[in-house]
Amino acid sequence: MADNIILECTECGDRSYLSKKNKRKHPERLSLKKYCPVERRATLHRETK
């Protein structure tokens, strides 16, 4: 059962990515390095609540 999650930039707070994750298999928060259009560079994006 995959749920939609929102990824938020840790530096500017922009929420520009949507992803899916199985919360039963991976209960910890997801962190990915992705491109931030506001910062115009790759930054760390974390799963929001």
From Swiss-Prot:
Keyword entries, A-Z: Ribonucleoprotein, Ribosomal protein
Gene Ontology MF terms: structural constituent of ribosome
InterPro entries associated with the record: Ribosomal_bL33, Ribosomal_bL33_CS, Ribosomal_bL33_sf, Ribosomal_zn-bd
A biological-process GO annotation: translation
Keyword match Ribosomal protein = yes
Query: What SUPFAM superfamilies would the database entry show?
Result: Zn-binding ribosomal proteins (SSF57829)
Any one Gene Ontology cellular component term annotated for this protein: cytoplasm
Q: Which Pfam families does this entry report, sorted A to Z?
A: Ribosomal_L33
- Would the keyword Cytoplasm turn up in this protein's UniProt record? no
Entry similarity comment? Belongs to the bacterial ribosomal protein bL33 family.
The protein in question is named: Large ribosomal subunit protein bL33
Instruction: Give the organism's phylogenetic lineage.
Output: Bacteria, Bacillati, Bacillota, Bacilli, Lactobacillales
